[in-house]
Amino acid sequence: MAAATGSLLLRAPWSGIFSAHPLASALSIAGALFCLALLVKVLFFSFPTDNAYLAGGVSPAVTTGQYALCRHPGVLWFAGFYLALFALTRTSQMLWAFLLFTAADVLYVVLQDRYVFPKTLSGYADYQKTTPFLIPTPTSLRAMLRKQP
């Protein structure tokens, strides 16, 4: 995906993007960077730093921070990143990348949520009952704000 995204960005018609819509372009770049930063944070800095994931055993489910917002917040930031890139480039290729990559990510987390995490994360069944799958709710937003790690 990274190579495809890089290729799409390199082939985008950059000469007209900034001159025609400078504010929209700046907001799109800011949105893409914001979503990318949140994606990196949720994927790499939201888990315990001990060797729990390397031991091959069952680890506790993370239920604080962004993981109180929904069970798979990375999907939100991933989709937001590609949506911002589409808004920036305004190309049909980036629209297709947004749609296909996001659909693949959703399929991946459905499989994780149904088959992998219930077996590898302790307390995941309870977490599924209290936290929305993908779409945050006002209740989950309040929970996220209360449960900062």
Model-found features: residue ranges?
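Short, amphipathic, aromatic/basic-enriched membrane-interface segments that mark the entry/exit
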Residues: V62-P73
